[in-house]
Amino acid sequence: MAGALENATKEIKRLSLEDTHESQYGQIYSVSGPVVVAENMIGCAMYELVKVGHDNLVGEVIRINGDKATIQVYEETAGVTVGDPVLRTGKPLSVELGPGLMETIYDGIQRPLKAIKDESQSIYIPRGIDVPALSRTTQYDFTPGKLKVGDHITGGDIFGSIYENSLLDDHKILLPPRARGTITSIAESGSYNVEDTVLEVEFDGKKHKYSMMHTWPVRVPRPVAEKLSADYPLLTGQRVLDSLFPCVQGGTTCIPGAFGCGKTVISQSLSKFSNSDVIIYVGCGERGNEMAEVLMEFPELYTEISGRKEPIMKRTTLVANTSNMPVAAREASIYTGITLAEYFRDQGKNVSMIADSSSRWAEALREISGRLGEMPADQGFPAYLGAKLASFYERAGKATALGSPDRIGSVSIVAAVSPAGGDFSDPVTTATLGITQVFWGLDKKLAQRKHFPSINTSVSYSKYTNVLNKYYDSNYPEFAQLRDKIREILSNAEELEQVVQLVGKSALSDSDKITLDVATLIKEDFLQQNGYSSYDAFCPIWKTFDMMRAFISYYDEAQKAVANGAQWSKLAESTSDVKHSVSSAKFFEPSRGQKEGEKEFSELLSTISERFAEASE
């Protein structure tokens, strides 16, 4: 009798719980690949996070029509049937922001892949697995800031810091942007995990507790106090980019190119060598072996910070959404990456976000749009492709962060674009070019000639050159003039090459022959770089500047000698050793230091002028 009574009580509790939660559940009405339609969803909001089916697959509401909601599911929907439950969570798709982001690899919706592997013992992500993005067991040494009990605090204020790793030794703990109040208690120095309460704030008579982490919806840009104009270069270590087509910290860059042109290599060299504090690398729909390459190479690569070598993985977060992962999650991966970048910008860091490749993201938009039955535009892409791209790129920039103390950070976006067949009139490329300020166009013919980086200097451009002239004038006088001269030589040589193909080189004047010879020298020894060598994998800006001076000095001296009546064929023969010295300038090891480099290059400049003076006598 007692057993029957107990069972009846349990059943009543279960039924009352079901009644309570019934309003939070809908039912699946139809399934079409990653797009699921659910009914009985009155009260749900756009972009609300839902759990689909008995496996609790993660999905997001993207359209509401009456009591029906259309959901894009971020996991494989095989086995989901009509009538399965859909649980509404009442919150948007958000990411966790706090200590532990560095050195971690996530999927498109910020699930930590290593933690999932350890938990599931599988190389694939089990459906419906729910692992927190930030480790709940790792302890961090929290140091409170200058704020104390009784002080007023607003969104973005720094109330403490932790040591995350030797490259990020001052990870600032921020109050979420929408929070404010008066501090009622703050934790003392000590070890805490990301869920432990370290701050208690009272506002309007209510007390709120805050830990070292907070969540933020990925589709909402994090607020800033003020947007600033960017004026400091994003140095890549690639001579052709730093000299001719520079980008700024807080700028937007597009790298379109056909398959095998070296987009991923440029993206990876940016991650390895750029002057950014934090790198967010988003592999969006690219091949899995490219992400595996990053994972294997990065821990072995070192950067020198204040005299000590550190693995660059310590400043990197990877968001891997490879081509065999669900299509819908590609869209989320771009937003996840930019939200992580904005979080570090709010700490006063200069962040580079590399998206490889935004074409795969656009393809995911096209597939979802097609399944929704929306009107297709150019090449089947949705009509809102340009607006989606613009809203993403507009989240880049240099800004003053919210809260105190004052800090300035930046987010630079470098996005690779893979147009089919290398056709730059592709809708994704044209939409991207209308938004981004720097265009590094890759050339298939250069790549086939093994000329890397395969940047086509005649189609590439940067709208930041004038903005950066102030920086160059104060640090490297003559830089702008040298850059313009190199561009002029290259464009003149292109016209002369067409003449040579028609009438031969002998028909050219000596002055034109010099232009052609120096252009070849610039292409082979300045624009080209060997990424597998110690001397050329990374070229500091001072070495780039000194090499520019050497090439232009050689060109000017040759032109001066010919103008004074010397014959170029004889002059070239008698000064061949100087030409060899100029072309060998790239072999100088940057590790020997700037002082030694400048000394060696100034000796080279004086040798050039002396040898030409002797030869023309």
Swiss-Prot record:
Q: Name one Pfam family in it.
A: ATP-synt_ab_N
Residues annotated as transmembrane: none
> What is catalysed by this protein?
ATP + H2O + 4 H(+)(in) = ADP + phosphate + 5 H(+)(out)
Q: Which positions are annotated as binding ATP?
A: 257-264
Q: Please verify whether the record's keywords include Metal-binding.
A: no
Q: Which PROSITE patterns match?
A: ATPASE_ALPHA_BETA
**Superkingdom, taxonomy of origin:** Eukaryota
Record's protein name: V-type proton ATPase catalytic subunit A
**Organism per entry:** Candida albicans (strain SC5314 / ATCC MYA-2876)
**What lineage, starting at the top, does this entry show?**
Eukaryota, Fungi, Dikarya, Ascomycota, Saccharomycotina
